[in-house]
Design a protein with these regions (language model features):
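Extended interfacial segments that mediate partner engagement and assembly in macromolecular machines
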Residues: 9, 58-127
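Cys/His-rich Zn2+-binding cysteine-cluster or related metal-binding knuckle/ribbon modules and their
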Residues: 10-75
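Long C-terminal interaction/binding lobes of large macromolecular proteins
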Residues: 8, 20, 85, 112-182
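Conserved phosphate/pyrophosphate-binding and hydrolysis machinery centered on Walker-type P-loop NTPases
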Residues: 2, 21, 34, 46, ...
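Glycine-rich, flexible loop/turn motifs
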Residues: 40, 52, 74, 91-94, ...
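Short glycine-/acidic-enriched loop or helix-start segments at secondary-structure transitions
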Residues: 53, 78, 135-136
């Protein structure tokens, strides 16, 4: 489990064996119920208990803006900002030849279907800035270049409160090249 190291796992296992209540059974049922009830949204791939997630079903959101992310979990931090009021599309991964993940393994076909079906005017790529994220972005930009849609990517740079001494060269380069006028 993410965030649970060997020591924590040992403590949890010992607690499960020693506890005198039915709490471990309740936790196991809750985990099983969650796995049964929650599945990917048919449109964007985010988590939902219905066919379509709350974000895709929200008519107050702009249907013209589509933010493409790597994983459904990438939607959560973007939503916490309340800065984006469009819709999302999770690819379910990124192109990674070393891991034997190609374009056919991602939700690219579904993205193309959405572009044909929906009135999307702008795609915002919010993929990681590593080699695989860049390869995926470049592949999609090349694939979509004939579509009548504006393609942008989220800005990159220094984190709020972060100093220059802790930033890597790529982050500093992107911060300098993506500067804005004051």
């Amino acid at each position: 489990m993410p965030g649970v190291g060997p020591r924590s796992a040992e403590r949890i296992a010992l607690w499960i064996v020693r506890v005198q209540s039915d709490q471990p059974d309740q936790i196991a049922r809750a985990i099983n119920d969650t796995r049964q009830a929650i599945h990917p949204c048919e449109l964007c791939g985010f988590f939902t208990t219905g066919e379509i997630c709350e974000i895709c079903a929200d008519s107050s959101r702009s249907a013209e803006l589509l933010c493409v992310v790597e994983q459904p979990t990438d939607i959560l931090p973007l939503e916490k900002t309340s800065a984006f009021r469009g819709r999302y599309h999770s690819l379910g991964g990124r192109i990674s030849p070393l891991d034997h993940v190609g374009p056919e393994d991602l939700r690219i076909k579904e993205l193309l279907e959405r572009l044909d079906r929906e009135k999307i005017s702008e795609i915002i790529f919010a993929l990681p800035s590593d080699v695989e994220g860049e390869a995926t972005t470049n592949y999609l930009v090349d694939l979509l270049k004939e579509k009548p849609v504006t393609m942008t990517r989220i800005a990159r740079g220094l984190p709020a409160g972060g100093g220059l001494e802790s930033a890597d060269e790529l982050t500093l380069y992107q911060a300098l090249s993506g500067r804005t006028k004051l």
